[in-house]
Amino acid sequence: MGLELYMDLLSAPCRAVYIFARKNGIPFDFQFVDLLKGHHHSKEYIEINPLRKVPSLRDGKFILSESVAILCYLCRKYSAPSHWYPPDLHMRARVDEFMAWQHTAIQVPMSKILWIKLIIPMITGEEVPTERLDKTLDEVNKNIKQFEEKFLQDKLFITGDHISLADLVALVEMMQPMGTNHNVFISSKLAEWRMRVELAIGSGLFWEAHDRLVKLPSWDCSTLDPSIKMKICEFLQKYK
């Protein structure tokens, strides 16, 4: 049994793993876990990942969850070019620092924009209160500024002159609001960094990985599993 990656490219962490594997020529079987149909709650998937999250990796009998752990595993097993996860102590620590920070500072608020502006209204027919969206946008703007000042500074990439895992993870997370046509790349510094990362990845691969996200507004939500719709309606309650 070869390497299997369980993913849905609506998920930013899945896109990071997918792009990294494709960019580095790592052979894998794509096991599609449709989040919109609740496949991550299926008995079969829970046996692979009891946390019911994506992505997951299965390499023979070895199973791994969490995108950052998966990216580091792939780096080591397949001897990826060193710029992805630099061997230099300080540069690698900088990547680790960003990875630890981004979970709550970037991933969570970026996903909230997608949920609040698109997914919840689309599925439930109910709008999330405007003040909730405004609060999330304020958080995003604050954290984007911190990203620019703390991590990017005046460098081409987070660790210097070359793309790293930190840049890849940062960009796919910041793309999440694009599912609602919300652009967070307002400043010239951030927009220029975004384009450098896209070009380093390859524009074809980059947009292939984001195709499912940008097409989300045209998704027919009548195909949604009723049990999943119920879970989302329950999820909405905390935004009221």
Swiss-Prot record:
Highest taxon of source: Eukaryota
Entry EC no(s): 2.5.1.18
Any one cellular-component term (Gene Ontology): cytoplasm
Subunit organization: Homodimer.
Record family assignment: Belongs to the GST superfamily. Theta family.
Keywords on record: Cytoplasm, Transferase
Protein name: Glutathione S-transferase theta-4
The gene coding this protein: Gstt4
Location in the cell: Cytoplasm
Chief localisation class: cytoplasm
Organism name: Rattus norvegicus (Rat)
GO process terms (BP): glutathione metabolic process
Positions that bind glutathione: 40, 53-54, 66-67
Single GO MF annotation: glutathione transferase activity
Residue ranges of every copy of the GST C-terminal domain listed in the record: 88-218
Domain GST N-terminal: 1-82
Any one Pfam family match given in the protein's UniProt record, by short name: GST_N_3
Reaction equations catalysed: RX + glutathione = an S-substituted glutathione + a halide anion + H(+)
Entry function: Conjugation of reduced glutathione to a wide number of exogenous and endogenous hydrophobic electrophiles.
SUPFAM superfamilies per record: GST C-terminal domain-like (SSF47616), Thioredoxin-like (SSF52833)
